[in-house]
């Protein structure tokens, strides 16, 4: 799984921009949030934060086993406290409606795409249709975000 995540993210070192990666201790249920200062390799933090029970095994970091940060909170928007702009991309938001941090903009599947996402998962045609619908939704979401987004120079 570590190698898969390394290939997926295409980077070995933490970015210069602030990045917080949440996970959950598999034994205690305690949440943890890693950043560049934590001393955890980026790829290992990403792998731990995406180790969902039943799909991937927990990932060991500093002798502890960790699971997907979504088990802490599906969106983790509380980690963005103080941010000017927060964008939450949650294509499955229709399954588990929840509130987001004040000011956060939620990008979710429209009703038609949601139906496709909920279709029979073993049908490759359903995946293709869901992918195409997601691409179309991304274009609409980009326009919505463009209308809301203000560059730092416009914030005063």
Regions found by a protein language model. Give the residues of each.
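Patatin-like phospholipase
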Residues: 1-156
